[in-house]
């Protein structure tokens, strides 16, 4: 009985949890939709240079770059488990980039741009600063920066909407 439990634990540690984390990162980045919408790389004509294949990979990954730069939600930030999943994917991809010597150079060149762009995007997700909301005041015509203004609803109403309750001067 103990042997069965130990084997199940080893299976979970080696196979189940890494694949679950990879799936979480892929689902959060939208990888299945962005890569399935592009042409199949193997259906491209085989040329002496892999320029056409590299162009196709870079075109299919433009959605990832746009997703990285997009402002999804004002309170969007990567939480601990998301960071853990992204770090696991980066680790798996970095091990996958170290190709064995038996693989020829052309196959390694075809896989490298896709993996490098994906690593760069995941690293940017980990190192990005959380984006705070910027409010443009219609009266003053200037951009006002509010760091963590979630608990300052009264101040926001007073400055932006002109609704005031309490003293006219904030000390």
Curated annotation (Swiss-Prot):
<keyword id="KW-0574">Periplasm</keyword>
<dbReference type="Pfam" id="PF06558">
    <property type="entry name" value="SecM"/>
</dbReference>
<protein>
    <recommendedName>
        <fullName>Secretion monitor</fullName>
    </recommendedName>
</protein>
<dbReference type="GO" id="GO:0042597">
    <property type="term" value="C:periplasmic space"/>
</dbReference>
<comment type="function">
    <text>Regulates secA expression by translational coupling of the secM secA operon. Translational pausing at a specific Pro residue 5 residues before the end of the protein may allow disruption of a mRNA repressor helix that normally suppresses secA translation initiation.</text>
</comment>
<dbReference type="GO" id="GO:0045182">
    <property type="term" value="F:translation regulator activity"/>
</dbReference>
<dbReference type="GO" id="GO:0005829">
    <property type="term" value="C:cytosol"/>
</dbReference>
<comment type="similarity">
    <text>Belongs to the SecM family.</text>
</comment>
<dbReference type="InterPro" id="IPR009502">
    <property type="entry name" value="SecM"/>
</dbReference>
<feature type="signal peptide">
    <location>
        <begin position="1"/>
        <end position="36"/>
    </location>
</feature>
<keyword id="KW-0963">Cytoplasm</keyword>
<keyword id="KW-0732">Signal</keyword>
């Amino acid at each position: 009985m103990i042997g069965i439990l130990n084997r199940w634990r080893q299976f979970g540690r080696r196979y189940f949890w890494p694949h679950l984390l990879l799936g979480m990162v892929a689902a959060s980045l939208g990888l299945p939709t962005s890569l399935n919408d592009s042409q199949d790389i193997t259906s491209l004509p085989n040329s002496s240079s892999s320029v056409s294949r590299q162009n196709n990979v870079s075109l299919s990954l433009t959605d990832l770059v746009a997703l990285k730069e997009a402002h999804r939600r004002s309170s969007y930030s990567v939480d601990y488990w998301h960071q853990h999943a992204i770090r696991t994917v980066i680790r798996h991809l970095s091990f996958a980039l170290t190709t064995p010597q038996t693989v020829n150079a052309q196959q390694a060149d075809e896989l490298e741009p896709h993996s490098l762009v994906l690593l760069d995007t995941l690293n940017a997700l980990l190192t990005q600063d959380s984006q705070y909301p910027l409010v443009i005041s219609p009266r003053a015509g200037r951009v006002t920066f509010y760091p963590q203004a979630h608990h300052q609803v009264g101040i926001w109403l007073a400055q932006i909407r002109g609704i005031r309750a309490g003293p006219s001067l904030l000390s």
